[in-house]
Amino acid sequence: MAEYIIYVGQIEEYQMLNDRQSLDAIFRKAQSAVVGGEVVALVRQNANGTEYRFEEISTLEDLNVYKKNVYKYVKEA
């Protein structure tokens, strides 16, 4: 099964920078993946380079819940 990977460290970096444009692009791709029947994997990359997959999103409802949580920490422009 195909999947789209979201690296959570990258999401956190964009949150700190208030980079809505980059976050929007990631979530557009994730939404397309879910609509196309793919799974969205949330992955954290450790300092030593190993990856830890801690959640999989397969529905638009779950993706929107995660997206809302992410944007909660982004300041309005």
Residues of each region from the PLM?
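Short, mixed-charge low-complexity intrinsically disordered segments
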Residues: 35-77
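A short, charged, amphipathic alpha-helix used as a generic interaction element across diverse proteins
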Residues: 21-41
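A short, exposed loop/beta-hairpin motif centered on an aromatic-Gly-Thr core
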Residues: 11-24
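Intrinsically disordered, low-complexity boundary segments flanking structured domains
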Residues: 3-4, 26-30, 59
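Short aromatic-glycine-(Arg/Gly/Cys) micro-motifs in beta-strand/loop hairpins
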Residues: 1-14
